UniProtKB/Swiss-Prot annotation:
Residues 530-556 are annotated as: Disordered. It comes from Halobacterium salinarum (strain ATCC 700922 / JCM 11081 / NRC-1). Pfam families: Cpn60_TCP1 (PF00118). GO terms for molecular function: ATP binding; ATP hydrolysis activity; ATP-dependent protein folding chaperone; unfolded protein binding. Forms an oligomeric complex of eight-membered rings. Belongs to the TCP-1 chaperonin family. InterPro entries: Chaperone_TCP-1, Chaperonin_TCP-1_CS, Cpn60/GroEL/TCP-1, GroEL-like_apical_dom_sf, GROEL-like_equatorial_sf, TCP-1-like_intermed_sf, TCP-1_chaperonin, thermosome_alpha. This is Thermosome subunit beta. CDD domains: cpn60. Molecular chaperone; binds unfolded polypeptides in vitro, and has a weak ATPase activity. Keywords: ATP-binding, Chaperone, Nucleotide-binding. One of its GO terms (biological process) is protein folding. Residues 540-556 have a biased composition (Gly residues). PROSITE patterns: TCP1_1 (PS00750), TCP1_2 (PS00751), TCP1_3 (PS00995).
């Protein structure tokens, strides 16, 4: 039905017949239901005992993972509110490297508790104000609970990496992997003028190999490039390498405009072939004149050019991935040549290029003092194994680097959430008005984390939360959390279950901002069909306008 307004006694049509509109409380219920559906899709993956999801793309590609951001990015979501929650995970991944599932789950719980407040006639503005106050106080309390990290404390930083990998594909070999990760971040860490530490993630690369055990993974100085020489007669390795990085095809230049040539005799054809060969020989000579004996080319290399490069004794690799070329610039302290005509000896850098014929990898090391870069060579039995291993190690790398830079860690196992929630309830007593109820709701939302950890471990979530609250009444027990492996409550900091403080602060920030953004919406205007059926109490997918695109990307 067309939306109408009356002006001077006459109806005015301002929306088309196909347009639909949902306002006020219906709009809030619609959005909250959509957001909760996304949060509930990943909450069962939280923690060491979390379950995996199988994602099947429209092309039939299968991904098995419990990585929150991977699941949400692969889901075929067709709802603007749900996409806001996906952005929470993406922001968390970009800013902190881990904690995506925690951030999304808390956002969903904040909206669930906000819905209860709305039913009690608490205005959205009061809820938003209360959530903002609570988020600010929560970040302050996280900092108060945090423990400072000595950059030389290898065991503690390894514990951060191991906590991140627990429950993921990297868990079984987490001791080996955490040691590799610690060495990697330390090798590229740089001390700043003010005494701080910065770890540039661009100086760490991950390469994967199938057909081996995870326990054969290793840390390499420099880069590992999964490529072959373009010609059999080329050297397989060059110890004293002079390397040129090239982003220009070593091929015959094509005419800028479409042209046609009539060839009337074999001599004419030979003339064209000779001209092409001359162009290729000139390009190869340009490379040789720079003094380079190794070329990593991002684009193609003509067969004839390969022949002449081999005659010059130059090792050449074609179609090197852009990401590998960029990493090689760090490893070699080199720049990329984009125009061979302008190439010179200054573009060539010294290094070492060796070859592992079994793994079909080039190992590249730089010699400059400004050269940086290490490679984690991860091995696994199958593609699925190494893909999940890479995701787990990537997250662990990020949180280890964050810990080294930020210098603060927190007890895991829900200890931080319960302690901060307890302090927020004390803070709520100082908040006047209905905002106090929102602060208390925020505290309740944080406690979702220990509840879900217990739930996913097959424990009673209510009993676990009650026991944790009781333990945290003692000022000396702020590190008491749930050991999901044993089912006992213990000092998780002493047990080595630790998390980076920055990731927890970012999770609080991302979750609260997303919840407030959803709560501010009181009107939805759609040009097409807009379903407004609410989901069930568990945040079912009903109520998501257009649904979730046929489910979670084919997830079964």
């Amino acid at each position: 039905m067309a939306q109408q307004q009356r002006m001077q006694g006459q109806p005015m049509i301002i929306m088309g017949d196909d347009a639909q509109r949902v306002k006020d409380r219906d709009a809030q219920e619609h959005n909250i239901s959509a957001a909760r559906a996304v949060a509930d899709a990943v909450r069962s993956t939280l923690g060491p005992k979390g379950m995996d999801k199988m994602l099947v793309s429209s092309m039939g590609d299968v991904t098995v993972t419990n990585d929150g951001v991977t699941i949400l990015q692969e889901m075929d979501i067709d709802n603007p509110t749900a996409e806001m929650i996906v952005e929470v995970a993406e922001t968390q991944e970009d800013e902190a490297g881990d904690g995506t599932t925690t951030a999304v789950a808390i956002a969903g719980e904040l909206l669930k508790n906000a819905e209860d407040l709305l039913e009690r006639d608490i205005h959205p503005t009061a809820i938003i104000k209360g959530y903002n106050l609570a988020a600010e106080q929560a970040r302050e309390e996280v900092d108060n609970v945090a423990v400072d990290v000595d950059p030389d404390d290898k065991d503690l930083i390894r514990s951060v990496a191991e906590t991140s990998m627990t429950g993921k594909g990297a868990e079984l070999d987490k001791e080996l992997l955490s040691s590799i990760i610690y060495d990697a971040v330390n090798q590229v860490a740089v001390e700043t003028n003010d005494g701080g530490i910065v770890v540039d993630a661009a100086n760490i690369n991950i390469e994967t190999q199938t057909g081996h055990g995870v326990n054969e993974s290793q840390l390499l100085r420099g880069a590992a490039i999964s490529k072959d020489p373009v010609h059999d007669q080329m050297p397989a390795a060059v110890e004293d390498a002079d390397v040129l990085l090239l982003n220009e095809a070593i091929e015959v230049e094509e005419a800028e405009a479409d042209t046609s040539v009539n060839i009337e005799s074999p001599d004419q054809l030979q003339s064209f072939l000779d001209q092409e060969e001359k162009q290729l020989k000139e390009k190869v000579q340009q490379i040789a004149d720079t003094g380079a004996n190794v070329v990593f080319c991002q684009k193609g290399i003509d067969d004839m050019a390969q022949h002449y490069l081999a005659k010059e004794g130059i090792l050449a690799v074609r179609r090197t991935k852009k990401s590998d070329i960029e990493f090689l610039t760090n490893v070699l302290d080199a720049s990329v040549v984009t125009d061979l005509d302008a190439a010179s000896e200054a573009d060539v850098v010294a290094g070492s290029v060796t070859r592992d014929s079994d793994d079909e990898l080039f190992y590249v090391e730089g010699e400059s003092e400004q050269a940086h870069g290490v490679t984690l060579l991860l091995r696994g039995s199958t593609d699925h194994v190494v893909d999940e291993l890479e995701r787990g190690v990537s997250d662990a790398l990020d949180v280890s680097a964050q810990t080294l830079s930020d210098g603060r860690v927190l007890p895991g196992g829900g200890a931080t959430e319960v302690e901060v929630a307890s302090r927020l309830r004390d803070f709520a007593d100082s908040v006047s008005g209905r905002e106090q109820l929102a602060v208390e709701a925020f505290a309740d939302s944080l406690e979702l984390v220990p509840r879900v950890l217990a739930e996913n471990a097959g424990l009673d979530s209510i009993d676990t939360l009650v026991d944790l609250r009781s333990a945290h009444e003692n000022d000396d027990d702020e590190h008491i959390g749930l050991n999901v492996l044993s089912g006992d409550l213990e000092d998780t900091f002493e047990a080595g279950v630790v998390e980076p403080a920055h990731a927890k602060e970012q999770a609080v920030t991302s979750a609260s901002e997303a919840a407030n953004l959803v709560l501010k919406i009181d009107d939805i205007i759609s040009a097409g069909d807009l379903s407004t059926d609410k989901g069930d109490d568990d945040g079912g997918a009903g109520g998501m306008g257009g649904g979730m695109g046929g489910g979670m990307g084919g997830m079964m």
